């Protein structure tokens, strides 16, 4: 972004090429800024022969000096993997004051964009829909600061079911005996025994000592203990879901480092997104761009030289 380009005239001859290379090398030797020799036209046979004779590569060809995204400053927020929990994503966005963050696949390509509004919208939906689909146990343990109690739980990768917050009067609740339920309880032996008897997929025990018979339990229930209270667990369990389930995907407007700012402005005027992902030549995410970055962009700086 801070490079200064040095070039001769169009349709350069040997003098123009050599002058650009010499001046760029001189300024780089002085060490004040980074200078790059370029050419804005095809190189002729005489110049190529001369460069080959002395072992020099011709300067890079630049077709136009129009400003590109690679020439300006843009945001470089941390990229989050698809499997990261919403709880961690929310904390990163809050601490870094980031409005929107890119979600990337394992190979670094874009999966989607996640905003604070996406997390809030999902959180509101969980009030009316307590179902959880394919929640990674690793995420759940991390968010709840929990530990696996029984050996069977270490073989479980994901859990699926309806979240049930067991109160004393919940003992007769039909959901408590559903194998697909995820039961949250405290130091309630009757509830624990009923849940294990029903074979619920997951039992989360809050702020209670774990009995030895639970450690040795080898049934089809993943048992987790946590130092958090049941109210917090009931909220955080939904925040353990991977961000890939709530991030915006599909028709995302992306820009590449080589895109020209004039073209970028036109596309931005036709849409109302807060920010846009910036990709490199391999479609890897390198940052985000917003309208703010286009207000006073830095232009390419050029030095024109000749003999």
Name what the model sees in each region.
Residues 72, 93, 101-119, 268, ...:
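A glycine-centered beta-loop-beta connector
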Residues 12-18, 46:
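Short N-terminal binding/cap micro-motifs at the start of the first secondary-structure element
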Residues 36, 60-61, 101-102, 182-185, ...:
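Short hydrophobic alpha-helical runs that function as membrane-insertion/retention elements
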Residues 5, 62-92, 104, 110, ...:
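Bateman/CBS regulatory modules and CBS-like beta-alpha motifs in cytosolic regions of diverse proteins
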Residues 130, 215-248:
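Long, charge-dense
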Residues 28, 32-57:
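N-terminal beta-loop-helix "entrance" segment that forms/cooperates
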Residues 116-132, 234, 293-301:
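A short, polar/charged loop-to-alpha-helix boundary motif
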Residues 17-28, 189-196:
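Histidine-anchored nucleotide/phosphate-binding helix
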């Amino acid at each position: 972004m801070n490079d200064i380009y040095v070039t001769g005239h169009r349709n350069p001859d040997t003098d123009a090429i050599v002058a650009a290379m010499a001046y760029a090398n001189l300024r780089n030797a002085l060490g004040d800024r980074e200078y790059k020799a370029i050419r804005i036209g095809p190189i002729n046979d005489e110049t190529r022969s001369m460069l080959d004779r002395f072992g020099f590569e011709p300067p890079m060809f630049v077709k136009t000096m129009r400003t590109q995204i690679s020439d300006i400053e843009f945001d470089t927020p941390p990229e989050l993997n698809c499997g990261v929990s919403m709880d961690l994503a929310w904390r990163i966005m809050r601490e870094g004051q980031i409005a929107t963050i890119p979600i990337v696949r394992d190979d670094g390509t874009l999966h989607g964009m996640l905003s604070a509004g996406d997390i809030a919208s999902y959180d509101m939906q969980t009030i009316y829909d307590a179902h959880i689909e394919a929640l990674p146990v690793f995420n759940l343990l991390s968010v709840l600061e929990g530990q696996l109690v029984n050996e069977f739980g270490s073989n479980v990768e994901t859990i699926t079911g309806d979240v049930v917050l067991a109160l004393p009067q919940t003992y007769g609740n039909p959901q408590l005996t559903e194998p697909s339920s995820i039961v949250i309880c405290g130091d309630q032996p009757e509830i624990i025994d009923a849940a294990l008897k029903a074979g619920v997929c997951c039992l989360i025990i809050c702020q209670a000592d774990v009995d030895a018979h639970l450690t040795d339990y080898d049934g089809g229930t993943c048992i987790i203990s946590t130092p958090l209270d049941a109210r917090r667990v009931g909220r955080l369990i939904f925040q353990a879901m991977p961000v890939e389930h709530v991030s915006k995907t599909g028709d995302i407007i992306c820009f590449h480092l080589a895109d020209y700012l004039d073209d970028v402005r036109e596309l931005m005027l036709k849409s109302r997104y807060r920010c846009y992902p910036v990709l490199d030549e391999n479609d890897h995410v390198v940052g985000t761009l917003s309208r703010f970055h286009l207000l006073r962009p830095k232009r390419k700086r050029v030095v024109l030289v000749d003999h």
